[in-house]
Curated annotation (Swiss-Prot):
The gene coding this protein: ZDHHC18
Organism: Homo sapiens (Human)
Tissue specificity: Widely expressed.
Protein name, as recorded: Palmitoyltransferase ZDHHC18
GO cellular component: cytosol; endoplasmic reticulum; Golgi apparatus; Golgi membrane
Primary location class: Golgi
Active site residues of this protein: 222 (s-palmitoyl cysteine intermediate)
Record GO terms (molecular function): palmitoyltransferase activity; protein-cysteine S-palmitoyltransferase activity
Upper lineage: Eukaryota, Metazoa, Chordata, Craniata, Vertebrata
Keywords: Acyltransferase, Golgi apparatus, Immunity, Innate immunity, Lipoprotein, Membrane, Palmitate, Phosphoprotein, Transferase, Transmembrane, Transmembrane helix
Record's compositionally biased regions (Pro residues): 28-46
Length: 388
């Protein structure tokens, strides 16, 4: 059946089409009252009202702007550009990261690059510019990308899960169990219940206490990038710290070379007094390069082992907590395969519809009995929110 479009026409909106020979009444002509009863008056056009949530019932002003889902997002995140970009609630440390990178590289391009390009080679500022733009690109992608947040269970899904657990059907409240077990590559993995998101967390998922979200393949919350590091932005985070270590080491070596060349034939202390900007770069790079190199090496080990920081700290697949060491079910037993799986796999789509509109409350067509549930819930697989 083809789709048809319907249009509501008011009974008094337009006259019926007249025959070709009929005479049209003039604009000032008025109907003459006949002997019969008067025709009924045309009904008034319907009045539409909207409530704050966008529904068709209730009081509200006409044409109120519907809210998008990022405006009512339950986590502690901040959104920009109409929900296209997101950041953690506390961005002070992230601003400090931007300040340190921009200040150090800015001073290097202004006070060191001209001298080194003139005395040595023009390749020095070119290499520094390439590293700088790559570092900034990876940092912004890490900070403003959804790390893999799982949407919280709706009221219907949470109620259906509690009813599924309580098989007796009694009205007494019984809290859901804290764990479930699933088999992954021959290894039993526990799924913990999140009382905030009202669902069993998928494997490798953890609830971030800072952002108040469940994040897939949760690695850690990094205040330096202002975001959680998870399944969807870990590759950008790893590329950021790795490229930042190269940029820091490159600037440190170039500044030392600059000061050494300037100090030839003169006092080294007087050279330091003449170039205070280079001294500031040297201090910043010296105190930051060790932590950046150490962090890059640690995450290289995690990538090669297909582990997360959260799993390594908790000792999930080792004997750090005094228990028996178990095999990592997510490892492919090959360093190259693990690196490709973590860094080169397809980027999964975001599961939170930030740009979508908040759906209005639907009116049920028939009354609901007290012994029936108020809504239908999705199957348990969808409530888990991810694949093993």
């Amino acid at each position: 059946m083809k789709d048809c479009e319907y249009q509501q026409i008011s009974p008094g909106a337009a006259p019926l089409p007249a025959s070709p020979g009929a005479r049209r009444p003039g604009p000032a002509a008025s109907p003459t009252p006949g002997p019969g009863p008067a025709p009924p008056a045309a009904p008034a056009p319907p009045r539409w009202s909207s409530s704050g949530s966008g529904s068709g019932s209730g009081s509200g002003s006409l044409g109120r702007r519907p809210r998008r889902k990022w405006e009512v997002f339950p986590g502690r995140n901040r959104f920009y550009c109409g929900g296209r970009l997101m950041l953690a609630g506390h961005g002070g440390v992230f601003a400090l990261t931007l300040l340190l990178i921009l200040t150090t590289t800015g001073l290097f391009f202004v006070f060191d690059c001209p001298y080194l390009a003139r005395k040595l080679t023009l390749a020095i500022p070119i290499i520094a510019a390439i590293l700088f733009f790559f570092v900034m690109s990876c940092l912004l992608q890490t900070s403003f990308t959804d790390p893999g947040i799982l949407p919280r269970a709706t009221v219907c899904e949470a109620a259906a899960l509690e009813k599924q657990i309580d098989n007796t059907g009694s009205s007494t409240y019984r809290p859901p169990p804290r764990t479930r077990e699933v088999l992954i590559n021959g290894q039993m993995v526990k799924l913990k219940y999140c009382f905030t998101c009202k669902m069993f967390r998928p494997p490798r998922t953890s609830h971030c206490s800072v952002c108040d979200n469940c994040v897939e393949r949760f690695d850690h919350h990094c205040p330096w990038v202002g975001n959680c590091v998870g399944r969807r932005n870990y590759r950008f985070f790893y590329a950021f710290i790795l490229s930042l270590s190269f940029l820091t080491a490159f600037i440190f070596a170039c500044v030392v070379t600059h000061l050494t060349l300037r100090a030839q034939g003169s006092n080294f202390l007087s050279t330091l007094k003449e170039t205070p900007a280079s001294v500031l770069e040297l201090v910043i790079c010296f105190f930051s390069i060790w932590s950046i190199l150490g962090l890059s090496g640690f995450h290289t080990y995690l990538v090669a082992s297909n582990l997360t920081t959260n799993e390594d700290i908790k000792g999930s697949w080792s004997s750090k907590r005094g228990g028996e060491a178990s095999v990592n079910p997510y490892s492919h037993k090959s360093i190259i395969t693990n690196c490709c799986a973590v860094l080169c796999g397809p980027l999964p789509p975001s599961l939170i519809d930030r740009r979508g509109f908040v759906q209005s409350d639907t009116v049920l067509p028939s009354p609901i009995r007290s012994d029936e549930p108020a809504c239908r819930a999705k199957p348990d697989a969808s409530m888990v929110g991810g694949h093993p």
